[in-house]
Amino acid sequence: THSTAIEGSTVTEIENQLLFDEGITAKGKPMVEQLMNLDLKQAYEQSMAWANEHKAFSVEMLKSLSAIVMRNTGSVYSTLTGEFDSSKGDLRLVGVTAGAGGRSYMNYLKVPAKLEEFCKHINKRREALLKNPDPTDAYLLSFDAHNILVTIHPWVDGNGRMSRLIMNHIQFEFGLV
């Protein structure tokens, strides 16, 4: 998928189609990349089902989607602050940066409260759009949701895929894609 290609996956669109439709893996491609694509596809399927139901955003919903995104590629991390499992959607208990020596994201201790705030903010705007649909406002909400979630960076891995998934979730919910 394009979302995993941004993350560095070398699996092409045609190879993904064969993987999704026929269960045929791409010769010479890393298994982790193929698993990443299968997991993301399942996350999109769950997300679209919830979008059709107009399910309210919650931290548990986000963690559940993250668990699907990271199901086969996540890991257990043991840190001084505790243990967490990215394949279960657990929030990070460590600091993270954008690449080696890159920008630091917010302190992990702030993440739970920021995610609650994020969900309340998104739900308030979603509810307004459900009452008075406006395609421009729906697009803006989806872009804002992507930007806010990737800025919070709640997980140790999969933040980009999750942020794009949530952006697409909102676009799907409001009939834009």
Q: Where on the chain are the PLM-derived regions?
A:
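FIC/Doc superfamily catalytic core
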Residues: 1-177
